């Protein structure tokens, strides 16, 4: 910061002393305010611009800092430096969030929760940008803007309405699995400390020999998963609409540090055809009895952020930010997010958002990305191109990336193994009877919206009947709709 921050008296942004920070410059005691009062103009102009645009999703959130520590050796799977050996610690910043609702909205609403981790590794940052649920609503990013529009408030009234949500998703049967999480008891986490996290997508690990392995990341809280039922959520949210943010902050301040264990599931890409689903389908989970959870490390949050604007609002996560040893897969939704997230950060924070302290790597870094809006990196080099015989900068040592052969014709199509109903049915049947009853009640209430047509109601009953026949029958009976299957 500027030395002006150490001044015993107020100054302007340029450092000039301010002898009266309470009164405007006027013509006499009661006269008009003068435009030449530069300090007033500067103060108001700064105030008018002190909020960056709200995130289009994940606007409501809370951040904390800490470390990730490797506890188990997985160097046979990846050459990632931050996973090089047990005991290695990497500083992190984590942001939890709700997804659909606005900044400042209650943290007790039924909504997925974001779980994003930025690792400041010795080989650059790694952003693992996930949610608390292991699946997603859609598998192709082409649908993403429409999906968010449907989940967001009505553009005419600015009221979030169930009929819009169920109308859109009546065209998207792949969403059923996600709804078995969202409409389940875990649809409203008790707070951020008591919820799972997931990388959601299938990623790729690459070892030193260049062998690729599909991977899914899972965070498990050491204090267990706890959720709120509707009456509890109404009571908690009515008393404090920022209860989860306060719980996170107060717990860390008291030395009760939240901790999660990191587990992975891995799959040999050569074995992907052995399953009745596509392993790159983000609407599917991998069976843990066949692909068991393997421990990797632990995440500990032991420091609250110092400034909400700098370390929460200006904090930017992008799934495109990976490190050697970790790579993407051909998951269509992940491929879309690789572009979309960095693009929205450039809109929200400016083209140099990665220079902001919370987003900048903590390791040495160099490139020729110069100037532009909001650039504040002081550089005095004469060489701003590559290569050059006047500059010793060279290529880094080569590291392995996936070498999969891609063949096929250009086409817009759905994946072959959609299998939209099996996993939702299995998950519903895993619920206890009282949990099933609460799930049914939530769907009956939602499908009873007066603007939902008989056709849409029938489609949803058909979908749930294909997932589980008894579930469809119960919904049809309570809604007085004849099941079509």
Curated annotation (Swiss-Prot):
A biological process from GO: hydrogen peroxide catabolic process
PROSITE patterns, sorted: CATALASE_1, CATALASE_2, CATALASE_3
Binding locations of heme: 341
Catalysed reaction, written as an equation: 2 H2O2 = O2 + 2 H2O
Gene3D superfamilies: Catalase core domain (2.40.180.10)
Highest taxon of source: Eukaryota
GO molecular function: catalase activity; heme binding; metal ion binding
Induction: By paraquat and 3-aminotriazole.
Pfam families: Catalase (PF00199), Catalase-rel (PF06628)
Cofactor(s) annotated in UniProt: heme
Places the protein is found: Peroxisome
This protein's UniProt keywords: Heme, Hydrogen peroxide, Iron, Metal-binding, Oxidoreductase, Peroxidase, Peroxisome
Keyword Lipid biosynthesis recorded: no
Gene Ontology annotations for the cellular component aspect, listed alphabetically: peroxisome
Family, per entry: Belongs to the catalase family.
Function: Occurs in almost all aerobically respiring organisms and serves to protect cells from the toxic effects of hydrogen peroxide.
Subunit field text: Homotetramer.
Name the record gives this protein: Catalase isozyme 1
């Amino acid at each position: 910061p500027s030395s002006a921050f150490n001044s015993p008296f107020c100054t302007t942004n340029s450092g000039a002393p301010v002898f009266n920070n309470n009164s405007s410059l006027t013509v006499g005691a009661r006269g008009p305010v003068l435009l030449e009062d530069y300090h007033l103009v500067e103060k108001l102009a700064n105030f008018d611009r002190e909020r960056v645009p709200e995130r289009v999703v994940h606007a409501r959130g809370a951040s904390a800092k800490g470390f990730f520590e490797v506890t188990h050796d997985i160097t046979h799977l990846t050459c990632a430096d931050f996973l090089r050996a047990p005991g290695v610690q990497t500083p992190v910043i984590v942001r939890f969030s709700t997804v659909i609702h606005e900044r400042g909205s209650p943290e007790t609403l039924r909504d997925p929760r974001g779980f994003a981790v930025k690792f400041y590794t010795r080989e650059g940052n790694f952003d693992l940008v996930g949610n608390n649920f292991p699946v997603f609503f859609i598998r192709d990013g082409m649908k993403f803007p429409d999906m968010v529009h449907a989940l967001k408030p009505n553009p005419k009234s600015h009221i979030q309405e169930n009929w819009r949500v169920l109308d859109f998703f009546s065209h998207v049967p792949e969403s059923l699995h996600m709804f078995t999480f969202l409409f389940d008891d875990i649809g409203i986490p008790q707070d951020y400390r008591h919820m799972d996290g997931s990388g959601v997508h299938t990623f790729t690990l690459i070892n030193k020999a260049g062998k690729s392995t599909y991977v899914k990341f899972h965070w498990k809280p050491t204090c267990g998963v706890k959720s709120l039922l509707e009456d509890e959520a109404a009571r908690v949210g009515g008393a404090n609409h920022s209860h989860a943010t306060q719980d996170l902050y107060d717990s860390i301040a008291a030395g009760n540090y939240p901790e999660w264990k990191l587990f992975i599931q891995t799959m040999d890409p050569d074995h992907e055809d052995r399953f009745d689903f596509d392993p790159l389908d983000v609407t599917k989970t991998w069976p843990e009895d066949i692909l068991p959870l393997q421990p990797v490390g632990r995440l500990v949050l032991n420091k609250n952020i110092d400034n909400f604007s700098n370390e929460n609002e200006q904090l930017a996560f992008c799934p495109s930010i990976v490190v050697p040893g970790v790579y993407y897969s051909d998951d269509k939704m992940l491929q879309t997010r690789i572009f979309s997230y960095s693009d929205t950060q450039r809109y929200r924070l400016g083209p140099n958002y990665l220079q902001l302290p919370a987003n900048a790597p903590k390791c040495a870094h160099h490139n020729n990305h110069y100037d532009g809006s909001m650039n504040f990196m002081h550089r005095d080099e004469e060489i701003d191109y590559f290569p050059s015989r006047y500059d010793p900068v060279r290529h880094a040592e080569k590291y392995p990336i996936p070498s999969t052969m891609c063949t096929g014709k250009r086409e817009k199509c759905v994946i072959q193994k959609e299998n939209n109903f099996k996993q939702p049915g299995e998950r519903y049947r895993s619920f206890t009877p009282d949990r099933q009853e609460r799930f049914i009640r939530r769907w009956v209430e939602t499908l009873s919206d007066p603007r939902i047509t008989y056709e849409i109601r029938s489609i949803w009953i058909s979908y749930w009947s294909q997932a589980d026949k008894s579930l469809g029958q119960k919904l049809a009976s309570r809604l007085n709709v004849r099941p079509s299957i």
